[in-house]
Amino acid sequence: DKAQTIVNGWKSRVQALRSRNAGKPVARVFYEVRYPNLLAAGRGGISSEILALAGGENVVSDGKKLVRYSEESLIAADPDAYIIQKGPMNPEPTPLAERDHYRDLRAQRAGRVLIVDEERFARPGPRALDAAEELENWLHR
């Protein structure tokens, strides 16, 4: 059956992601949903699942889907990588280098800042698996 073949293909890709990332260092990642009035992806949503599949760890420990996050907490977390979601929730994101308090973040200093499409990285569905594979390549390059 064609549907089962497609589902099996997705399962195989998920397993391949998990296998490739087993034993690799885990990057601590902040996922920005909106700025200003900083809103982060919490551990309860698809964005955090994509991060985990890609071999990253969300620095936001709250189990909600979306979390209001203070700049002080972000600076204290000092993530290895920073993802900025672009889309309806964050239509014209300000580059990290242009934000006074963000310039010294480890992610900014290391050039580990990625702007991603909200449609692919924040919506459940087959494209989320594509997003995880893309993010894995970026995190582990």
Residue ranges of model-derived segments:
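N-terminal ligand-binding lobe of clamshell/alpha-beta domains
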Residues: 1-141
